[in-house]
Amino acid sequence: MPLPLMMINYSLLLSLALPPIAGGIIGYFTNDLAIKMLFRPYKPLFLGPYQLPFTPGLIPRNQERLAKRVSDTIMGSLLTPEELQRLARKLLQRERVEGALGWLLQLALKQIREDKQQKTAQILANILRDLFSESLPRLLKALARQDNFLSDQINRIFDQILLEFRLSELQSRQFADWLLGTVLPPDTIRLALVDFLSDRNIQVIDEGFREKTSGTYWVVANLFGVRNSLTRLRAFCLEEKETANLRLKELLLSLEIRNRLKDWLQQLSLENLPVSTVRQLRRTTGEVVRTYIRERGEPLLKDFGSSVDWDNVAVLIVNRLQSSTAVTGSLGLVSEELASILERYLEDDLEKIVKQIIPILAIDQVIINRINETPAAELETAVQAIVRSELQAIVNLGGVLGLIIGGLQTGFFLVSRGF
């Protein structure tokens, strides 16, 4: 084949093949080139004192505005208040909340067990000290002003304890021994007898005995009377003290006063009193207790609070709680109840809470700051990675479109040449 004809064929082949090949290459690499043109150069370039146009790249030059637009788009379309409420409800499902609360309670109990400095005991001691020294006295003072304060409690104690109270046999014997040994010993009875047998009382007894007797007793009363006998008894008690005490003691033994007194004390009960008397006693007991609490309740509690070693009490309580199976066994129930309370609260106020949280979290400002703080090179790398991993079909489509456009140009060329 002659050389000129061969050169014409090569030239024609190149003219036909070059447009599709060039179009495919340009279409394939246009995305990378466009992305690079958006970010490059990262910093402004200067020619002498003049800044070159289109430097820095479009995105670095408008990064703050881009950050604001991205933030507005996300907050306006993606993270709307309704979407945040939906996410909050999903996050705060009862099972998750219950599990989180249970974990927190377990963690708190573990922290208490590992507390070497007894911080928990110190806090509890301060609470107990304030409760019994300040808070309860003030509360008691305020409540004691009510007329029905502790009315039900006092009546219940009176009916269940005081009304049914009886001395046991041992208590009755000890009480009788105390009465006859301390309150009414023979010497005390002798002195009481001497005081009773005064001249006037003896005269009254003698006259009454004379006037109110009849028959044989009248004869004895008017012939002999009782004046001389009572006078001699008084003189005997005054002059023969030890002998009189001994005779009185023998008389008490012979009359079995101790046993009689013990039996009487053992049978003594408020239930044997009339109903009206019991009601009055109940009313009087309540008034006495309330009056005492009004007048002495506050200082009594303060004295009690200041006299107790609350530090030691708090340590004992904390140590007991650490080893208590009731505490560890009730953590699940406590977390369940707390989750139920939180669920009821969130049903009514979740929308209000989300509206209050959004300004506090300032998500839009976080997005703006994060974009502004990210270097342009990192943004470019991230965009390139997304394009290569998720948008590779667009890159391939660019190459195919370039190839098709190049083929169309070749077709127009052939048509224009008359092939």
Swiss-Prot record:
Residues 1-22 form the signal peptide. It is found in: Cellular thylakoid membrane. It is a single-pass membrane protein. InterPro entries: DUF445, UCP032178. It comes from the Bacteria. One of its GO terms (cellular component) is plasma membrane-derived thylakoid membrane. The chain crosses the membrane at residues 394-414. Pfam families: DUF445 (PF04286). The keyword Acetylation does not apply. Keywords: Membrane, Signal, Thylakoid, Transmembrane, Transmembrane helix. Belongs to the UPF0754 family. This is UPF0754 thylakoid membrane protein sll0412.
